[in-house]
Amino acid sequence: IVSYIFSSFKIYDRPHMDEQYRHVYKAAQEMDGVNYHGTVSNDQIREELTKNHIMAYPSVYMETSCISVIEAMSAKCMVVCPNLGALPETCANFAWMYGYEPGPEKHIAVHSHILGRAIESYRKDETEVLLSLQKTYFDTFYNWDMRMNQWNQFLESIKMRIEMEKNDTT
């Protein structure tokens, strides 16, 4: 098992914060079985995801959505994550999801257990079928062209409502 880490505060336009985590990045670079890459382009991440099998995502943030998970699931990666924030809706019942634990030690234990089960089941035929269905779902419902059309329809409906209200008052 090899872990690929793509992480840095540069992506959040806060590169100065990397300094306080330099020891963490250095430890990751020196670990056997870990390939630390820092921040890379979105195109490179999407390419790398197609070469991977599982995304371990032990998030502790109340996400409103998660583009990382969406792109991993579109790349046929199995995702292991907590049921925190909007991750249940984002993952659409495809993730190996577990109940979020606020205590770090308990969270690590639960995440590790579920991740181990996901690794054990990865090569099963039914997993491949589910991952193919997952890819189809995410490529369909998280498609940027479709999202653009939905937003255009939404904004058009607001515009129409404003025009109707304006006509009603005149």
Regions found by a protein language model. Name each.
Residues S41-N52, S74:
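Short acidic alpha-helix that forms the nucleotide-activated donor recognition element
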